């Protein structure tokens, strides 16, 4: 599939503190955050005029699901637009707190674990064809996804009985199955629940829930772009070496705990390889694949392959500074190590834990990642203007455009409506509904007529 539909869902951690002490419960904070949303949407589960979905997930976690995008850079832009939308809700909620005489700062964290050991996710969505065996697709992807954390982990200081350790992935400790239809109870690498949000006879939605949430735009580009390339190779029938893991769940933890990425993990055929070996194998095949298809014009693939290769080389040569501006877990590790050495702290210090958390704060004046971005210490994929526009403008080349235009007009005309990923409905006497099953289709006469009738 040369043109693919992508989507990202990010759950956010939330807290409210005053002078270091927790001030409000997550439920109370969530109510303040979503008060403005509920006032116009009459619900804490709404679709926005940029085509995205914003809602409160289990455990009072705000979740933002991007609109459908057909390019990885677009998806990165719309994911960042989600951060800005939530930051706006945060600022408004803090203003309300002050008006009501409640002292405290609200923090939204784009991470995957809290201090109590709970985990919340970043879910990636890739549209794939219905033809072919989904189980075979999953079999090839699992070793790639288990080892992919060395490219796109968010990093975490983990407190263990043997002391504090720096792990590559936040999510690795919370994954319990390779493939499953559950998302919360067993937390698989790939979720197999068959909800395509499209024509079920033509498409299937690959739902990957093993990845970390990323602050870094370049890490996000690599995570999504490398996965897309592997999918394209599988779809094109490229012969990939059998890398089936003997125990993927043990392997994902072993990889996360080994910053050298050299620890041997056992394959089902008895061979032993490292996470680096697995990633080099996929990378070399992807380079051949793009070259063979005359990929000179595919600038995104070239950028992905370049960063993929440089990241593996930086790890292999133990020269992480090579990608310290581009790879989340490396950026944060370098930041923590400099802070520790400057202040003479151990990895177990509460000040290090605070720094670890502040990296993920999406408030641009408080979050450490954004302070680094402002200082020019990290690389970008997006432009600020594009992110700002994406807060209210849907992608123009996918179904999201139809949804966004419908919502915008209905709100302007103060019409009651209901939408989901595939339906647009006017709640009038006629209950007119348009079913949009093709996520690639951005123009539809039926939708135009529905909009014109308002």
From Swiss-Prot:
GO terms for molecular function: ATP binding; ligase activity, forming carbon-nitrogen bonds; magnesium ion binding; ubiquitin-like protein transferase activity. The keyword Ligase applies. Pathway: Protein degradation; proteasomal Pup-dependent pathway; Protein modification; protein pupylation. The keyword ATP-binding applies. It comes from Frankia casuarinae (strain DSM 45818 / CECT 9043 / HFP020203 / CcI3). This is Pup--protein ligase. Catalyzes the covalent attachment of the prokaryotic ubiquitin-like protein modifier Pup to the proteasomal substrate proteins, thereby targeting them for proteasomal degradation. This tagging system is termed pupylation. The ligation reaction involves the side-chain carboxylate of the C-terminal glutamate of Pup and the side-chain amino group of a substrate lysine. Its EC number is 6.3.1.19. Mg(2+) binds at residues 9, 55, 63. Belongs to the Pup ligase/Pup deamidase family. Pup-conjugating enzyme subfamily. The reaction mechanism probably proceeds via the activation of Pup by phosphorylation of its C-terminal glutamate, which is then subject to nucleophilic attack by the substrate lysine, resulting in an isopeptide bond and the release of phosphate as a good leaving group. It holds the Pfam family Pup_ligase. Keywords: ATP-binding, Ligase, Magnesium, Metal-binding, Nucleotide-binding, Ubl conjugation pathway. The gene is pafA. GO terms for biological process: modification-dependent protein catabolic process; proteasomal protein catabolic process; protein pupylation. ATP binds at residues 53, 66, 421. It comes from the Bacteria. The active site is at residue 57. InterPro entries: Pup_ligase (IPR022279), Pup_ligase/deamidase (IPR004347). It catalyses: ATP + [prokaryotic ubiquitin-like protein]-L-glutamate + [protein]-L-lysine = ADP + phosphate + N(6)-([prokaryotic ubiquitin-like protein]-gamma-L-glutamyl)-[protein]-L-lysine.
């Amino acid at each position: 599939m040369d043109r693919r539909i992508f989507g990202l869902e990010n759950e956010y951690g939330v807290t409210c503190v005053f002078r270091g002490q927790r001030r409000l419960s997550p439920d109370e904070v969530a109510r303040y955050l979503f008060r403005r949303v509920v006032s116009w949407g009459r619900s804490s589960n709404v679709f926005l005029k940029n085509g995205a979905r914003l809602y409160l997930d289990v455990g009072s976690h705000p979740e933002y699901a991007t609109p459908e995008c057909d390019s990885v850079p677009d998806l990165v832009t719309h994911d960042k637009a989600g951060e800005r939308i939530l930051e706006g809700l945060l600022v408004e909620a803090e203003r309300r707190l002050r008006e009501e005489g409640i002292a405290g700062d609200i923090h939204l964290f784009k991470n995957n674990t809290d201090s109590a050991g709970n985990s919340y996710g970043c879910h990636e969505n890739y549209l794939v064809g219905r033809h072919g065996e989904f189980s075979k697709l999953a079999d090839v992807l699992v070793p790639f996804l288990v080892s992919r954390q060395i490219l796109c982990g968010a990093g975490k200081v983990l407190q263990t009985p043997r002391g504090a350790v720096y792990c590559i992935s936040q999510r690795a400790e919370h994954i319990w199955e390779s493939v499953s239809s559950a998302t919360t109870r067993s937390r698989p690498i790939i979720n197999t629940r068959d909800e395509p949000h499209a024509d079920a006879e033509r498409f299937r939605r690959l739902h990957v829930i093993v990845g970390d949430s990323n602050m870094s735009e370049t890490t996000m580009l690599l995570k999504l772009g490398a996965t897309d390339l592997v999918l394209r190779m599988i779809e094109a029938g490229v012969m990939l070496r059998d890398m089936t893991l003997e125990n993927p769940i043990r392997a994902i933890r072993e990889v996360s705990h080994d910053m050298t990425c050299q620890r041997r993990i056992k394959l089902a055929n008895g061979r032993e390889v490292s996470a680096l070996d697995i990633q080099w194998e996929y990378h070399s095949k992807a380079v051949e694949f793009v070259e063979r298809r005359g990929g000179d014009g595919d600038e995104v693939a070239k950028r992905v392959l370049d960063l993929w290769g440089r990241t593996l080389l930086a790890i292999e040569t133990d020269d992480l500074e090579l990608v310290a501006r581009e790879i989340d877990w490396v950026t944060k590790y370098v930041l923590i190590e400099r802070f520790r050495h400057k202040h003479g702290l151990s990895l177990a210090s509460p000040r290090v834990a605070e720094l670890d958390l502040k990296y993920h704060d999406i408030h641009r004046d408080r979050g450490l990642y954004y302070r680094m971005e402002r200082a020019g210490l990290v690389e970008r994929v997006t432009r600020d203007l594009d992110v700002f526009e994406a807060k209210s403008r849907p992608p123009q080349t996918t179904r999201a455009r139809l949804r966004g235009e419908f919502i915008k007009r209905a709100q302007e005309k103060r019409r009651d409506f209901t939408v989901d990923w595939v339906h647009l409905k006017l709640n009038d006497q006629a209950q007119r509904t348009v079913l949009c099953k093709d996520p690639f289709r951005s123009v539809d006469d039926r939708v135009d007529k529905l909009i014109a009738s308002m």
